[in-house]
Swiss-Prot record:
Protein topology in the membrane: Peripheral membrane protein
Lineage, broadest ranks: Bacteria, Pseudomonadati, Pseudomonadota, Gammaproteobacteria, Enterobacterales
Protein's name according to its UniProt entry: Phosphatidylserine decarboxylase proenzyme
Known partners and oligomeric status: Heterodimer of a large membrane-associated beta subunit and a small pyruvoyl-containing alpha subunit.
Modification after translation, per record: Is synthesized initially as an inactive proenzyme. Formation of the active enzyme involves a self-maturation process in which the active site pyruvoyl group is generated from an internal serine residue via an autocatalytic post-translational modification. Two non-identical subunits are generated from the proenzyme in this reaction, and the pyruvate is formed at the N-terminus of the alpha chain, which is derived from the carboxyl end of the proenzyme.
Pathway where it operates: Phospholipid metabolism; phosphatidylethanolamine biosynthesis; phosphatidylethanolamine from CDP-diacylglycerol: step 2/2
Site (Cleavage (non-hydrolytic)): 253-254
CC cofactor: pyruvate
Enzyme class of the recorded protein, top EC level: lyase
Family, as annotated: Belongs to the phosphatidylserine decarboxylase family. PSD-B subfamily. Prokaryotic type I sub-subfamily.
Subcellular localization: Cell membrane
Gene: psd
Length: 322
């Protein structure tokens, strides 16, 4: 019954107004109160402030400043092998694997539509049918900037208005087409591994989604699909990003979905649902060049994995009582 009640709240609560309220509060300068809120947040979610460029919580004027805090340059080493794609975000893998024609795995026994995720853009969807996907959830404790898995030339960006359902174990199991219903920003890149989409998905209390080339994409929330295009590389006005370079950020967190063309990449074999991710670590390898099979993400301490799982609502430690 408790889970049924929680799920009902996802439909009943005014998620847009809650999100606006959270965004308003997170942007306010409140002196000692801001520091108190940040300190409580750090303690509750076990945020490792030693990784931040500014480890002193008093140095953040607003909660948003804290939430998008940059990390020290040395804490996320980048795998520089040109045949290896790297993880775009700190977080936990929700699902990953093969796109089955138009179906992407949302949760065990539940799929959603590739074409719906891409706002009905069947031409873009055709690039990724039978390709590969990875869905990464960023928990509240995580670094909330998103980076490039490989070198890329930006070709298209689409803002898709939508719902603001929370992303967690309960909604993934019970809200049909969750990621294709939520607000999102779709970024399409040309890469040496074929076309790649990197999709930033909103959720309840995600105050804004930003990119490095266009700034804040949402808000405002105008309720209409918006589309931008860019020229190929070497042309005036083109946008080129390097592997490991920041491409966007969330103010209050959510989900990143990566789509890769069929036959272009092999996911690292040890990765699975609930694997903890760190920016710059191996995610996939090229299918066209030999890469040593022992390539793996660097092992993480057990307490770091536990803290990440404890903070992630994707990990369901309670028996479902519905």
């Amino acid at each position: 019954m408790l889970n049924s009640f929680k799920l009902s709240l996802q439909y009943i609560l005014p998620k847009l107004w809650l999100t606006r309220l959270a965004g308003w509060g997170a942007s306010k300068r409140a002196g000692w109160l801001t520091k108190l809120v940040i300190d409580l947040f750090v303690k509750y979610y076990k945020v490792d402030m030693t990784e931040a460029q500014k480890p002193d919580t008093a140095s953040y004027r607003t909660f948003n400043d804290f939430f998008v805090r940059p990390l020290r340059d040395d804490v996320r080493p980048l795998n520089t092998d040109p045949n290896i794609l790297v993880m775009p975000a700190d977080g936990v893998i929700s699902q990953l694997g093969r796109i089955e024609e138009d179906k992407i795995l949302q949760a065990k026994g539940h799929n959603y539509s590739l074409e719906a995720l891409l706002a009905g853009n069947y031409l873009m969807a055709d690039k990724f049918r039978n390709g590969t996907f990875v869905t990464t959830y960023l928990s509240p404790r995580d670094y909330h900037r998103v980076h490039m898995p490989c070198n890329g030339i930006l070709r298209e960006m689409i803002y898709v208005p939508g719902d603001l359902f929370s992303v967690n174990h309960l909604t993934a199991q019970n809200v049909p087409n969750l990621f294709a219903r939520n607000e999102r920003v779709i970024c399409l890149f040309d890469t040496e591994f074929g076309p790649m989409a990197q999709i930033l998905v909103g959720a309840t209390i995600v105050g804004s989604i930003e990119t490095v080339w266009a700034g804040t994409i949402t808000p405002p929330r105008e309720g209409i699909i918006k589309r931008w295009t860019w020229p190929e590389g070497e042309h005036e006005g083109s946008v080129a990003l390097l592997k490991g370079q920041e491409m966007g950020r969330f103010k209050l967190g959510s989900t990143v979905i990566n789509l890769f063309a069929p036959g272009k990449v092999n996911l690292i074999a040890s990765l699975a649902s609930l694997s903890v991710t760190k920016i710059g670590q191996p995610l996939a390898t090229s299918t066209e060049t030999f890469v040593a099979p022992e390539v793996e993400p660097a092992p993480l301490p057990a307490d770091e994995i536990k803290a990440e799982h404890d903070a992630s609502p994707l990990v369901d430690n309670k028996k479902d009582d519905t």
